[in-house]
């Protein structure tokens, strides 16, 4: 295949998912202010799914304009509990508060992936996972945060299901790749349709 693929993310985990799938690509960071993009969206009543898609698209478009001819993969994930939207916690106290809010409830992860070339969107997709946390007491939350440390601050929701964070959950409805922030199977299918990968 001669199409250059670029992942518009410096996330080592997203890179690892693509590498493990046998995809050849480079990475580049998008130059966008995510909070500035999403604030008016929420004010206008956009859903968390819409926001994830728009942010993924903004990243893909930005990087595609700087990489002529390349097909760029943009990704984003939002987490919502009812009408409340959550971001990565900025400190351990914020992580503790998030986990207390999620305790015994079902929140939603919205993972978007977009393909763009030369500033134009080729394809967009959003997958949703429903995550039900078990009832967590304050002592367990404190021990969990002590165990995972700064990993809690690098993830929306203060957890990684691929590590000790899985112990927080009672039930999960959704695809693993949606949960970790890159809907891989729909992405691979579209990359094959676009003749970007063999298939």
Curated annotation (Swiss-Prot):
Gene3D superfamilies: 3.90.950.10. The keyword Hydrolase applies. Its cofactor is a divalent metal cation. The record marks 13, 77, 162 as: Important for substrate specificity. Keywords: Cytoplasm, Hydrolase, Nucleotide metabolism. It catalyses: N(7)-methyl-GTP + H2O = N(7)-methyl-GMP + diphosphate + H(+). InterPro entries: ITPase-like_fam, Maf-like. Its EC number is 3.6.1.-. It comes from the Bacteria. The active site is at 76 (proton acceptor). GO terms for biological process: nucleotide metabolic process. Its main location: cytoplasm. GO terms for molecular function: nucleoside triphosphate diphosphatase activity. Pfam families: Maf. It is found in: Cytoplasm. The keyword Hydrolase applies. One of its GO terms (cellular component) is cytoplasm. Belongs to the Maf family. YceF subfamily. Nucleoside triphosphate pyrophosphatase that hydrolyzes 7-methyl-GTP (m(7)GTP). May have a dual role in cell division arrest and in preventing the incorporation of modified nucleotides into cellular nucleic acids. This is 7-methyl-GTP pyrophosphatase.
């Amino acid at each position: 295949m001669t199409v250059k693929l670029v992942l518009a993310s410096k996330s080592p985990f997203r890179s690892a998912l693509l590498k493990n799938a046998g995809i050849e690509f480079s990475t580049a960071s998008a130059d966008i202010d995510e909070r500035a993009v999403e604030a008016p969206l929420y004010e206008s009543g956009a859903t968390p799914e819409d926001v994830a898609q728009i942010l993924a698209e903004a990243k893909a478009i930005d990087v595609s304009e700087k990489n002529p001819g390349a097909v760029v993969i943009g990704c984003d994930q939002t987490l919502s509990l009812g009408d409340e939207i959550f971001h990565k916690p900025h400190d351990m106290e914020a992580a503790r508060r998030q986990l207390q809010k999620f305790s015994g409830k079902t929140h939603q992860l919205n993972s978007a992936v977009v393909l763009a070339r030369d500033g134009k969107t080729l394809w967009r997709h959003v997958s949703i996972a429903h995550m039900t946390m078990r009832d967590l007491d304050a002592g367990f939350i404190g021990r969990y945060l002590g165990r995972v440390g700064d990993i809690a601050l690098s993830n929306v929701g203060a957890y990684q299901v691929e590590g000790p964070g899985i112990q927080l959950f009672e039930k999960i409805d959704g695809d693993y790749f949606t949960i970790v922030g890159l809907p891989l199977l729909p992405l691979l299918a579209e990359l094959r349709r676009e003749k970007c990968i063999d298939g």
